[in-house]
Amino acid sequence: MARLEDLASAHYGETIWVLGSGPSLNFLTPQFFEDKTTVSTNLSAHTLGFQPDYVFSHYHRWAREMPARMEKVTLKRDTLSLEEWAGDVPDDVVLIEQDNYNPPGSAWNPLTTHPPKPHSLAYGSSSLHGSMHLAAWLGAAHIVLVGADCGTIDGEHRVEGYPDNDKLWVLYNEHHALMKEWLVREYGVTVYSLNPFVNLNLEGHKFEGV
């Protein structure tokens, strides 16, 4: 089993790209990420068709299913079952501890009521928050979110082929902004989001957000 401490500042000063699973990924190619340091949230990179450098997930099943040759970071206890990791822990899996493994829900706020546990990563309402924190932990100077859309494009709310999931866009929209604010304060990073179109008119595609 790898340790989170071993990953600290492994990519100091770099730009790190953090993938959510939103529909804007449908307008990107896997080749776009070939020369980039990437952190995938759950199955996002796998669904798009490339192998990221790191994966963060709240779910043991998805951490197990990811191929070798990349670091997988997950909670010591699975978010759904609340059970500890069963069996041997592979060398490419990092288990992080939390004081409480119950899902934090709508009240989550890293700035006030839910500061991330020291020497661990944020446990937010979305696995994306842990991915964002992992990028900062790795030493990123700049974090670029990809597919953190909090809405639909042409009626689609996920990248094509991704397992159907919840649509808590109002909640996630609020919490993503709180996570950004915390990272800027604690790490001095910049946090931006990729628009795969030429401008915010989306080349005629229709976005519906919160």
Task: Give, region by region, the residue ranges found by the protein language model.
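Metal-ion/cofactor- or nucleotide/acyl-coenzyme-handling active-site neighborhoods
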Residues: 1-210
